[in-house]
């Protein structure tokens, strides 16, 4: 039997500390498009007591974002106060016995980068600005982090910004969506190339979502059309990573393939997020999978068996690799539901270990009730409430197999 995953907690910079006023998402809260993030969970003020509290609760690891918009609020200006703050957070975490997996990009970006300089839409953003930032972060904090995650949920980043248009730069252009997806694959690998010279391992992030075709009638053509849609989405979301990590080729349907030296077998860990499955219909509309899965207030429908399905699919496509669940969770008022989903998720990682699949770490979203872009502060998402009182779900994390 392989050792089971080490379960920790995950949070974003915005969720734990609120959005920086230099972030490109800050305008969304000012306009009322997103709920006010204020100070998030308050972690930025309470981390000196929060981290020992989490360690005492048996939590050994934390995924946390090093906020670029705080570190570099203006182009070329490295904010010493932000550097000192992040250094202190990482130092306190290490002293408490908590390993931090540091994320470099999880959605919000500095406004000067994404808006004034067109961000990753501009070739200089990918070739010059992003590598310079990665290098500086690695040099400053590399001795204090346990692992790196260059870009969290790259498919979702491209989808929201360039197809749905719900996040900066607010585009709804299928061609731009494909180009941005390609660019984020390249940006992730460029960060891996720079970070891999240091000691902490680097994890790629595949934001997974099992998709099944759905029908509203008995027409065979409808099922065929739904199946083709599923194949198209799956090729973009999952299949592109199979070509990339196995063959060294970034293959985004509709764009020219790019073979990149060193890409095959890249990254120390194949990381992934999992937040439920989806049913996709011929007309492009979606529902949860299974259809009757209860939908949480943030619109997601956790399906714990799907986590096991996803782990096995990853193991089949990336034989011999090590894996990490970079994010899974539940935003809901009912902690008994949260405990049920957490217990089921722990069971699936244990079952994978019993089958010889190496899942080194798993991260539950989140530790302490904080801000989410979908629900603001209205719906709890932590195993601790904002008063730092533990819920039943916190005891499940403590009892998770080690």
Predicted ranges, named:
Residues 1-30, 75, 87-336, 347-402:
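Active-site region of glycoside hydrolase catalytic domains
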């Amino acid at each position: 039997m392989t050792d089971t995953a080490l379960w920790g907690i995950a949070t974003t910079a915005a969720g734990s500390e609120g959005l920086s006023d230099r972030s490109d998402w800050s305008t969304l809260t000012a306009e009322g498009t997103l709920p006010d993030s204020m100070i998030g969970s308050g972690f930025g003020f309470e981390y000196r007591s929060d981290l020992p509290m989490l360690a005492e609760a048996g939590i050994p690891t934390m995924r946390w974002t090093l906020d670029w918009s705080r570190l570099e609020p203006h182009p070329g200006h490295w904010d010493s106060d932000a550097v000192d703050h992040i250094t202190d957070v990482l130092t306190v975490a290490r002293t408490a016995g908590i390993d931090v997996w540091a994320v470099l990009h999880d959605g919000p970006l500095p406004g000067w980068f994404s808006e004034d300089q067109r961000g990753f839409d501009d070739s200089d953003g990918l070739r010059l600005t992003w590598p310079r930032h990665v290098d500086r972060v690695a040099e400053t904090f590399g001795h204090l982090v346990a692992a790196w995650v260059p870009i969290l949920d790259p498919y979702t980043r491209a989808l929201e910004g360039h197809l749905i248009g719900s996040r900066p730069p607010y585009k709804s252009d299928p061609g731009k969506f494909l180009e941005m997806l390609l660019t984020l694959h390249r940006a992730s690998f460029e960060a891996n190339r720079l970070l891999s010279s240091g000691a902490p391992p680097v994890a790629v992030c595949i934001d997974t979502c099992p998709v099944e075709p759905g029908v509203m009638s008995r027409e065979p053509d409808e099922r065929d059309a739904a199946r083709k849609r599923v194949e198209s989405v799956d090729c973009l979301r999952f299949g592109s990573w199979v070509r990339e990590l196995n063959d060294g080729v970034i293959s985004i349907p509709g764009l020219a393939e790019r073979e990149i030296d060193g890409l095959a077998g890249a990254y120390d860990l194949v990381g992934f997020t999992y937040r439920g499955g989806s049913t996709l219909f011929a007309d492009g509309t979606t529902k949860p999978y299974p259809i009757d899965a209860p939908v949480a207030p943030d619109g997601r429908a956790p399906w714990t068996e799907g986590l096991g399905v996803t782990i096995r699919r990853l193991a089949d496509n990336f034989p011999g690799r090590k894996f990490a669940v970079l994010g899974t969770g539940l935003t809901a008022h009912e902690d008994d539901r949260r405990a049920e989903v957490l217990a089921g998720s722990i069971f699936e990682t244990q079952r994978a270990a019993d089958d010889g699949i190496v899942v080194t770490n798993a991260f539950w979203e989140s530790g302490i009730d904080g801000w989410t872009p979908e629900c603001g502060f209205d719906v709890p998402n932590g195993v601790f409430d904002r008063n730092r009182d533990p819920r039943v779900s916190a005891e499940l994390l403590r009892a998770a197999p080690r």
